[in-house]
Each structure stands twice: as structure tokens, then as C-alpha cells.
Amino acid sequence: SDYSRKRDPPQKYEEE
């Protein structure tokens, strides 16, 4: 859950 680089790692959810 990298909120700083959420576009880099493959996350199941996007915490914007």
C-alpha cells in the first residue's frame, strides 16, 4: 500500500 507511489506498485485498490 504505497500511497506515495500508488501508480507504481500493482494495488488491488486505489486509495486516492
UniProtKB/Swiss-Prot annotation:
It comes from the Eukaryota. Keywords: Antibiotic, Antimicrobial, Fungicide. One of its GO terms (biological process) is defense response to bacterium. Possesses antifungal activity against P.infestans but not F.graminearum. Antimicrobial activity is not affected by salt concentration. Heterodimer of a large and a small subunit. This is Antifungal protein 2 small subunit. It comes from Malva parviflora.
